From Swiss-Prot, chain A:
Enzyme nomenclature, EC number: 3.-.-.-
Top EC class, one word: hydrolase
Function: Probable metalloprotease involved in proper assembly of pre-ribosomal particles during the biogenesis of the 60S ribosomal subunit. Accompanies the pre-60S particles to the cytoplasm.
Database matches in InterPro entries: Creatinase/aminopeptidase-like, PA2G4/ARX1, Pept_M24, WH-like_DNA-bd_sf, WH_DNA-bd_sf
Gene, per the UniProt record: arx1
One GO-annotated biological process of the protein: proteolysis
Subunit structure as annotated in this protein's UniProt entry: Component of the nucleoplasmic and cytoplasmic pre-60S ribosomal particles.
Name listed for the protein in its UniProt record: Probable metalloprotease arx1
Curated annotation (Swiss-Prot), chain B:
Zinc finger (C2H2-type) stretch: 5-30, 70-94, 208-231, 259-283
Protein name (record): Cytoplasmic 60S subunit biogenesis factor SPCC550.15c
Similarity section: Belongs to the REI1 family.
Modified residues (Phosphoserine): 150, 155
Amino acid sequence: MELDPSDSNSRVVDASQFSKYRDAGALVSKAFHQVASRCVPGASTREISSYGDNLLHEYKSSIYKSQRFEKGIAEPTSICVNNCAYNYAPGPESVIAGNDNSYHLQVGDVTKISMGLHFDGYTALISHTIVVTPPPQPGMGPYIGPGADAICAAHYASKAVANLLATNNSDDPITGSRLRKIVDDIASQFRVSVCPGSRIRRISRFLVGQPTIDRLEEDQNTKHAVEWPAPEEETRKADVTNSLDPANVLSTELNTWHVMPKEAWLIDISMSSQPISSLKEHPDLKPTLYIHDVNVSYMLKLKASRSLLSEIKKEKSVFPFHFGSLSSERNLLGLRELTDRHILVPMPVLISSPSNVIAREELTVITQPNPSSDLLCLTVPTPPSYVKSDFSLEDGTDAALICEGINVNIKSININV
Amino acid sequence: MSTSFACTTCTVAFNNAESQKIHWKSDWHHYNLKRKVASLPPLSAEVFAGKILSIQKQNEEVQKKAEFYQNCEVCNKKFYSEGAYSSHMASKKHRDNLSKFQRNSRIKKLQSEDASSIASSTLSMGEPVVDSEIEEEEDLASQLTSRAISLSNLSLHGRESEPSKTELATSIPQSNEASKSHLFTQEPTPEEIEAELARRSSQRLSPRDCLFCAASFSSFDTCKKHMKASHSLYIPEREYLVDEPSLFDYLAEKISIGFTCLTCNREFKSLEAVRAHMQQKGHTSIAYDTEDEQLELSDFYDFTTSYPDYAVKQDETVVEEDGSSGEGDWEDVSDDSDNSSLDSLEMGRVPIADEYELHLPSGNRVGHRSLSRYFRQNLHSSSTAVGDGASIHQNVARRAMSGNARAYRQAVETSIAGVRDGRKNYSASHIKSFQDQRRREEFANKMGIKNNTKKHFRDALLQ
C-alpha cells in the first residue's frame, strides 16, 4: 500500500496542531452554548442558524489574526427538529414577502444544533440535542416518550464511546467492531436504533468525512471509521462469525485498524426512536448547504456560475458552507450549473417519517494527547436536557460499565479561552 | 536488178513480194526503223546478227548470275553472288556461328527425342515443344524458354535422363551471355534473374569504393570524406542515424546491383550508366523528401530521442529514485496540456473510450474529430483551487485512485470532460458510418451538380 509518510504523520496531533484543535473546540463550544440558549418556543430556526453562523464568524476572526492559514466555519449552524436528521439551515430564501417561512420552535421539539469551526483545517465539530421547553417552572416534569429514549441513548452512546477511546492502550486496542458493538448495545437497551449517517471516525487536517472526499478516503484504505448503516460485507461477515461462534465475534471480525494515541476522533451518533433503514431528502425544502468538490473541473458556460465559483474558491474551503453566506445575489444564478456539473455538492435536508424522533450527539476528541492524560474532549459536553427515559442501561453489561467510567479520566477544555 | 521489191530503210532488195513482207516483220527491220527515226544509218544484216548474238550472250551471263543463290543457315543469311558467299564462308564470324549451331542442334535433337518419348509414353495433350518451329527459330531466347519448358516437363514427369541433365548444366553458363541482350525484351525466367543477380552482386561496390565514381580508398572514412568533398553527398538527419555502415552498404547495393539512381530512383542498364547519369545530373544526394523515401531508409535511423516523452521518461526515472517528488510530476504533466488533443500523459492504461482515441507509440493521444469540441477546450487545471484544504483533498483523491481509476480521472479531466452519453453515441455512430467521408462526398457531389463540374465516368462494362 502506498502511504505518504508526511500524510500519515499528520494523523497524529502534535503540539501546534493541538492548540488549533483546542481553540476551535473552545470557540465552537462557546458559540454553541449561546445558540442553545436561544432555542426557546417560538424562535425562528432561520434566525438561530444565522445567529450561530455570525457567532462562528466573529469568533474565528478574533483569533489567529496574523496567521495566513485557512480558518472558518467547518459546519454552518443547522437546527434540525424532531424527525429531521441533518442539514436544516434555513437561509434568506425562507423569507417570502416579509414572512419568515422557516420552522419556528415549539415546546417539546427535540432540537439538534450542530456547528463546527476549523483553524488551518483542524476541525472541531459539535452537535447536541436539546428539548425546547418553556422557562423552568416548579413542578414541571421531565420530557418523556420515544424522544427521551433517543436522547438518552445518544447521550450514553457518545459518552460510552468517549470513555472507550479514553481507555485505549496497546494491550487492549480499541477496534472498529468494539466501537460498533457498544453503540449497538446501548441502542438496543433503550429500544431505539442507530440512525443512518452516524459515524465514529478518525479525522485529520481538512478531512472530517466530507461527502465529497469520504468515498475516496475509503478507496485509499486509510479511513478509520465506524459508520452506520454498516457496510454490507461487514454485516455479512459478522453474521457468519456469529453463527459459527458467537463468543469469538470480536476477535474474528475484520479489524484492519485500531485507535492510536494522539489521534483526533469524531464521535457523531444519532439515535432514532424507530428503526429506519435510510433517510430521505425533504421533498420541498431546497438544500442550503453546499460543499465544493475540488476534484471536479469543468468549463462553465454561464458568467454568473464562473464568478460564483471563483468566489467560492476564494472564500470557502473544502468544508460545507451556507449559500446565504455568499456575497452576491446575482451570482446565485450560476448555482444550478455548478450543482449540475457536480462542482458543488448539495447537502440535502434529510428527514425520516414524521412520527420518528431523532437525537444526535457529536463530539470531537483527541486520544491521549499526553501520556499522563487520557482523553481530551474538544467540545464541552453539554449536560442533557431534563429527560427521562423508560429504559436504562442494564447493570453489569459492558455498556453500563463503560458509561459509568469509573477509571476514566476525561478532561474538558476551558471554554473561556 | 529490179527495185520493185525493196526495203529503203534497210537498203535491201527482194526477189518477190513474199520475202519482202517477211522482212518487214523481222526484228532487223524494226530495229532499223527505230534507228531511222533516230536519224541513224541502217545496220547491215551481219552487223545486226552479231549484235543479237552478243546481246544474247550477255543475257545468258546475267541469267546465269541471277540464278546463283546460297543460304547460310548457320548465320541466317542469304547470298546471290558466289563471291560474297565464298567470302562469307571463309569469314571468322561464320565459323564461330557454325560451332555454336552444331552444339545447339545436338541439344535440340536430344530434346526432340525426349519430347517425342514423353509424348508417346503419356499421350499428353498440348505438348509445348513444337519441334518444327523451334528448329527453324535461331533465336537463342526462344531456345532458352523452350528449354525451360522442357525442363519443367522433365521434372513434372519425373523422367529425367542423365545425359539431358548434364547437357543442360553445361549449356546454362553458355546461354547466360546470350540471354543478357534479351533480358529486358523477353520475360526473364527465375534462373535468369538469379544468374543476373549473382553476376551483378559479384561486381558490387565495397564500402571503400566511391558510390559515384570509380575511385577506391583505403578506408571507409576516407571514402566518406571523398564523397562529401567531391560529390557533396549529404546524409539527411545525421544526428538520428544509428547504423551508418549499413546505410552505405544499402546505397552501394542500390547503385551497383539495382543500377538505380539515388536521387530520382531511375533504373539503368549498367553501373557505368547509372554513375554517368548521377554525375551529369548532379544526382549525388540521398532522396529523403517523401514519406516512402524516408521509410525506405528508416531501418538505419532511430528517432526515439526526438519523441516528446523521451525526456520526461528519463526525468521520471530520476525522480523516482529520490521518491518524494513523484507526485509533483503528475501535475506538471497535466498542467502543460494546452494542446489538449495531443496530450503527453501517461499512456497505455487510459481505459476510456478506446474507440475515440489513438494511442501513438510516442505517448501522444489523438482524439477523434467528432469529439474535437471537447479536446479543444482549454481546461484550467484543477490545481487552480486555492488553499491547503483543496490541495489536501486533491492529494487524497489522487492517491485514492490508483491505476485505472486515476488514469480515467485524468482522461476525463483533460479530454472529454462533460461528454454525455448522447454525445458519445453520436460519436460512435459518426465513426461507424464514415460520416466524415460521406459528408465530404455529398458536398462534392452537390457542388459538382450545382456548378456543372461533376466528373462523369462512363461504365466500361456498358460500352
